[in-house]
């Protein structure tokens, strides 16, 4: 995957559910959800603490990435996107602290410097924040050199 081209977050989103047993309702397992925005199309929504997206075989090249940029929307401050290589606790590239944008469908591009992203790796976008409330919505992301 080319991280220097715009990557739509929802094209790699996953969600799952599990059933506890026959006579009880479904319980949702951790995962991301999608919805349609009138302004930008499909997005990853209702992101909560410890949800994550994994992207396989991201080729950062020899010179590597210097910056991560994401198109986000949020009514509140307090969410973040932690960037890691190869596993949930792998090498840390950087963390984008998501600032309030004015609403769940008010979109802004926000960015953060990154380091250590060279070669080909699996990339983890791990969402962080306090409590169980939704943190922000994510439309697309990209890296720059």
Where do the language-model regions lie?
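Extracytoplasmic
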Residues: 1-145
